Amino acid sequence: MIKLIGCVLIISACTQMGCAMATDKIRQMKYLKLFRRLIFETRAMVEGGMTFGEIILKLSLQKDYSDFTFLSQDTSSPDVRRRITEEIHKSKLFDNEIRQTAIDFFEKLGTTDINGQLAYISMSLAALDEQISRLSENFTSQVRLCRALGVLSGAFIAILLI
């Protein structure tokens, strides 16, 4: 009886681990799409002639981007750009490739004329679109695979213990 209870606990723990991995994949896609929308909205702000500080302030006040803690920096400080990039680097919201795209975006934002910024925004959007399409190719199968691997690993461990 104790072995059976132990096996059920192991299977349920491994199932939860698989669900956590699947949730992580879903969260990664959510934040990637949200960051793409942030860059797209930034394009309109740059076209409107807003400065770097105004853009960061406006983005930080929007509820959609409340998970992006790197936006909540004091824009009156001269080293706001450096602090934002440091916060992005520490952030766990993105994987390494997307994190580097975000760092590059905020390092370049507001450093050139409007046409240069718009060109760089277009390049950043193209890079994010490529990353989104790459992640979307097998997204549902990867989520299902994570869940299935959790259940199967739990069953395998339970069988080994019996």
Regions found by a protein language model. Name each.
Residues K3-Q73:
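Juxtamembrane/interface alpha-helical elements of multi-pass membrane proteins
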Residues Q28-Y31, G53, V80, I98, ...:
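Residue-level recognition of alpha-helical structural elements
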Residues I5-M17, S136-I162:
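Bilayer-spanning, highly hydrophobic alpha-helical transmembrane segments
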Residues Q62-S66, P78-D79, A127:
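A short structural micro-motif
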Residues R37-A44, D104, M123-E130:
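Short amphipathic alpha-helical coupling elements at transmembrane boundaries
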Residues G110-V151:
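Membrane-interface, cytosolic juxtamembrane amphipathic helix immediately N-terminal to a transmembrane helix
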Residues F70-N96, A158-L161:
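Membrane-anchoring/interfacial helices and their immediately flanking loops
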Residues I84-N115:
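Short, non-transmembrane cytosolic segments of multipass membrane proteins
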